[in-house]
Amino acid sequence: MAGDQPQAWSRRRLWVLLAGVCVVGLALLVGLGFAIRTAVVHATRTITPAAATRPAGGRVDRDVLLAEPMLQVAPADALGGAPAVEPAAALTVPNSTRTGPARVVTGFPRTPEGAVGQLAAIEQTVLSEMDVARAGEVHRAWVVPGAVPVDQWPLVRHVQSFLGSAGMTGRLEAGARVTVDPVAAQVKATDGPDWVVVCVLVDVRALVRVESRMAYGYCEAMAWRGGRWMVASPGAAAVAPSTWPGTELAARAGWRTWHVAGE
């Protein structure tokens, strides 16, 4: 697996996030910044993806595909950047058609783009609600049995870190709000029609007295099970580059502009 392990959003990253937002009340807001994973502290460098490892028999090593390093960026790259002169190519994501288990929208097709849509729906539900119990409910409904345990799932750990450092117990308190909007995505790897590694870049806004904003990149392996895409990562995926959407750096990191089918 990759050397960089996903970690909960850290307090240290919040200071970076809030540096240009608000100094008054910073002690309270230390829990409200959305941190880039602590592992992403190295100097920016370009990773050239290697070909998938194929053991004897021609089978793809899925763990290698999941852990294949991606472009490493600085934490500040999630907070802003100059718009690119040439916009990135679009990735058209199909619409959901119904509400599925744990009240997460579903009905996405059996395509890599469908897996992108499903992962985004799972991520939006967990991070916008910021509720530990709900995060556990979504994990039970949407993570393949035997895959990443609930206490190691990145989304659960982010919810715990956010609430704990903000002094909230178990869920968002009245007056606080988090919005999560997908802005870009990429299909990192595929192995047949039923298994893919997809990544979603979201625009996250947290409001508690003042508004904070950042970009957050997130990857998972997704497997087609029982007529729907489910999270199937056995462990940590490679750290996804959290880059400000629409920048040259975002394009270099492989992000394609989010486009909803029919719009």
Region annotations inferred by a language model:
Residues M1-V85:
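Amphipathic, hydrophobic N-terminal targeting peptides for secretion and organelle import
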Residues R11, G20, G107, L127, ...:
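Conserved aromatic-histidine-acidic binding/catalytic patches
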Residues V60-A74, V85-L91, V148-D151, G164-E173:
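Short charge-dense sequence patches
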